[in-house]
Each structure stands twice: as C-alpha cells, then as structure tokens.
Amino acid sequence: MIRLALKFALLATFCMGVCGVIEADEGMWVFDNLPLKHLKDKYGFEPAQAWIDQLRGSAVRFNNGGSGSFVSTDGLVMTNHHVGADTLQKLSTKEKDYYKVGFVANTKAEELKAPDLELNVLVDIRDVTAEVLASVPKDATDAAANAAKRAKMAEIEKAATTANKMRNDVVTLYQGGRYALYTYKKYTDVRLVFAPEFDIAFFGGDPDNFEYPRFCLDVCFFRIYENGQPAKPRHHLNWNTQGTKEGDLTFVAGHPGRTSRLFTVDHLKYLRDTSLPFLLDLLKDREAFLLEYAKTGEEKARQSKEDLFSYQNSLKARMGGYTGLKSPEFMASKEAAEAAFRKTIESDASMKEAYGDAWSKIAAAEIVAAKSLVKYNFIERGLGFESTLFSLAKTLVRHSAEVRKPNSDRLREFRDSALESLKMDLFSDAPIYPEYEVAKLTHSLQYWQSKVGANDEILKKALAGKSPADRAKELVAGTKIADVATRKKIAELAPEEIAKLDDSMIAIALAIDSAARAVRVDREDYVEAIETANYSRIAQANFRIKGESVYPDATFTLRLAFGTVKGYQELDGRNIPPYTTIGGTFAREQAHEAQEPYAIPKSWHDAKIAGRLKLQIPFNFISTNDIIGGNSGSPVVDKDNKVVGLIFDGNIHSLILDYGYDDKLARAVSVDSRAIIEALRSVYNAGFLADELTTSK
C-alpha cells in the first residue's frame, strides 16, 4: 500500500475524465469510434476495416464477467482459468475436482457441458441516442426523464429482439451522453475443453495477485456448439508462435467492466469516504469468514474455494483503488482538471446556463446516496442474505410480478430481451450445498445485525425472532427451490399463487420485497436519475468543446486498447523487465521452499525432469495496454491480428485505472502465446489442441 500511496506524485499525466487529446496509449475505445489517426501518427499503423472486423468478430463476452476469443475454425474459445473458474467449480464433485486438478478433453466427445454459461459475440452497434432522448417529455423531472428513457430502451430492445432473435442491449455511454444498441449472437451450448491445475493457473496465490513478476498459466479453453456440432464462427484469430519482443505494438479486444474516469470530484469523494469503506469492510469480513470455513474440512474448502478467490481478488483490487483516491496528489490533479473544465464553461454564457450547475446537482445526489447506502446494499442488493437459495427465491418472486407488467414498466433485468438469459441462470442445475448455504446465510445475517443493530425493523422481520444461526437453518431446511423442477413450476405461478406457497425462502423473499423495491426506487429516482441527467449535460459540454475524440467509461461492452510491450522502474529503483520465463517459475518455487501458494504441480516437475519442458520460453509479459477487471481473458494480438498473449491481470500500479490512466508504472499482465503452446505439448500431452491453435486458418 505504501508503493501505491507514493506513486501518485507522478500522476500529472493522468486522464482526468475530460481529456480531448489522447495521452500515451490511453483509452478503452468503442469499435465504432477507434483512434485511427492517433495509431497512424504515433505508430504508423492504420488498421484496415477487414482487420477491425476480424478482431471484433473474434472477441467473445463471458456473461458471468470476463472476456475471450475464438481461436479456431471449430468454435474453440480461449479465456482465463479464473474466468472459467465458476464453471469448473460447478462441474466439480468431491471425487473429481476439476478446479483443483485441471481437465483435458482428449476428444470432442469428452468435452463437458457447462451448466449455465452464456457467451456473446457482438454483431452490430447502432446509435439510438436520438430515439432515447426524444422519449423524454419537456420539463420532465430527472426521475420522470429517467423512467421515460428506461421505457424507450426496453422498447428498442424488444423490437430488435423480435426482429433479429438475438440478444439486444441498449448501452448507456458517457454516463448518459450517448446511447447505443448492441446486438449479440448468443451461445448457450458451451463445453469445457481444457483447464490446467489451479496451482499453476494461480501460482503465487493472493500474495502475488496484482504483482509482477508473475508466473501463471491462467488459461482455459471452451468450445461453442450449435445444433450439436462445433460452431463455425465467421471470424477467429490465428496464433503467433514467435510471440513478441520488447517495444512491439499490441492490441487488446475485451470487455472492461466499469470505470469511473468521467466522475466528478464530489462523486469520487463519495466513493472514497463512504462507498468504498463500506465495501472494503464487507470484503474483509467475507474473506475472514471463508478462510475459517475452509479450515473445517477438505470438502468445505473445495465448495467455497472459488468464492474465496473472488472475494480476495475484489478486496485487493478495491483496496488499490481506494488507496489511490486517498492520495492528496491524485485528488488535487482531479480537482485541477475539473476546475479548468468548469472555468471554460463559465466563460461562455450559453454554456454556463446549459451546463453550469451539473456538478452541484451530482454532489447533492451523492449525499442522498450516502444516506441510503446501508439499506440499499443489505436488502435490495441482498448482502444481508448471502445465499444462492435466497437469490433464486427473490428472482422467482419478482419474475412472477414483473412479467405480468407491460415490458416498458418492468425492472430492467426482467424485460423481454433479458428473460432468456435470466432463466438460464434461474434454472441452472449447478450444485447447491445446504451446509454451505446455512453457513453463508448465518454469517451475512450476523454481519447485517452488527451494522444496523438488533432493533432494525427490516432485520427483525428477516430474523422472525430467532438468532441468525437458527434462522438460517430454518430457511435452508424449509425450502424446496434447490430442485430445478420445483423452480420451473414456481416460475409459472401468479403472484397470488406464490404467496400461498409453503416455502421458507419464498416467504422471506416476499416479506422484504416491498421494502427492497422502495429503496431501489429511491436510489433510481433520487440518485441515479440525477447522475444520469447531469453527467449527460457534462458529456454534452465536453462534446461541444472537444468533439467526440474522448472514449466513454467502460460498460462491459467490447473495447479496443492498444499499447506496447514495456518494462518499468519500480519506486524503489528496481528495473522490472517485461518478460518472465518458465524456468523462473521453478526458481520462485525454490525461493519459497515449495510452500503454498508457490508449489508447482507434479505434471510440470515431471515434464522438467523428462527434459521436455523448455525453461527459457517466456511465460508472462507486461504491456501498457489500458485494461481493468472484465478484460480478463482478452486476447492480445499483434499488427497481423495474431494472438501473442492472453490478458489475466494488472500489476499493483494498475489498480487506480478505474479512475484514470497511467503508463509510467501501470501494466497489463498476460500469459505469453509461446508458453501456452509449450504447456499444451510438453506438460499436458495435448498436442492436438496446440495443433488446432497453430494450424487453424
């Protein structure tokens, strides 16, 4: 944390959210507004439309939160082991723990069907800004305007879905400055092909997470099927078996989740002073609980391992961003950039009238957000009910009510265009472990009680006069919705029929639903609506001053980032070279006496002893590509659109990238394409898979 705090004195070149001229290799660019002139001016590279189309068409979105790419003509998709971890966990049993020991399908018949995995491939982007904004009545309040826009977005999505039978999402860009309809081809027959052991996919564990040097084979392969046969994608990426060298230009096509680079200073202060401290406390609590739970038995550790990784990863990432926001130098640079932008607006009477008070209105909204933060998170977001069974019950209760409303009046997750994906999750046959459910629910109820006190009215309703432990046992024991067939039957019931069910989880979901809906409405009307309206005004001001050469904040939609393979100098003076090697992994294991999480799997030692493993081959490398969470699994390609790497992490200095860009110290971390092929051939006896990657044209 000290290194993060010290580094912000160096951030004078950060993008402060209103930049117009591209600095360095900054930007997560939408594919219909790429920085082609900058690429040509700086690198002498001007991608042809065919190059853009191939990369866009090869990129895959994992709907559980990650990226991937087609890498063969037979529907083979590459991503990270940690993106595939959810599926690996769901496919695993006490007898076969694929998450731990890995998996290789030697034939297509051996590939394992993922229980509830949806992959999306972008096929079209259409600007619908005019349609969305035209739906807002004159003199509408911010809340009414937001409702009108949501209704229009639902209408656009439904019309598109009816016409093209694909997935259609209206995406809000520039915090409300632009709206675009993203159309995706959706795949739901997805099968596991290959995953390495956890101990090499995540070598170094949490201590090395967001650090560099790294030594990880964080890769996983799936295959998409259509009509029972391997899919034949229109586009895929070929493989560069020679890899990169320092200074090479690289590109990343992926789906960064969320950034806050366009946020106002007051909004960032809300994150720093209220939202992030709340979240960090929760993450620390959940991590401590899961660490203790894992100690109570090997099977319990297996069942909870992926959850533990997720919480630890989130905790480290959010702590890094929080440390950045706590830096006086960083916040001073944000304040200076905002002041300069506002001064430009104030100097023009028409712009002052149109946009001048947007910042103060956002500041007022954050005060409201702070007041509702605890209630909103515990009852609407469900942090007080950490339970898969409760989440399913809540979805069933709301599904019954929402689908009987006009499409435009529904909660967004229940609109017609989203229902197919929602039902895939709702009717997943992934295992649910009752004992783990009781433990999670007990702990989350206890944590909720510790934050609001035993006299909180909604908590009292949830506990029904019992202790958290007794109530959790009662709720898990008294529900039948762990059974998929039961969930399907309940999903057909009307609200009045659901209210008559004798099911504990359904009953508790019903009991708190009105309170949860109320706090959600307050959040949408008095926080999000005001933010959207006024960020839209700020975006319009920025467009008037600088045009549309500014990239929008990340929205888990397809973006292009570019950068070069480049080392850096640490704050303590150490020079960090861009590459690590396979041999370096064994040296790091020896330095840590092969203690977890620095124990290399036996398969790798066997390959080394047999002389098959080429230790000098580059394993991981770093580059200046602008990436964040959600980019995990993104392909790294060269100027020929060939795979040279696979994004899996950022270094510790990249954790501020949610709020601004830096290329002095921040780096993206990738698995080298050469290491992937070497591991497949020399460690896993999967030369057939290496051949598919390197010979597919």
Set out the residue ranges of the language-model regions.
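Terminal presequence/propeptide segments associated with secretion/organelle targeting
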Residues: 2, 9, 19-697
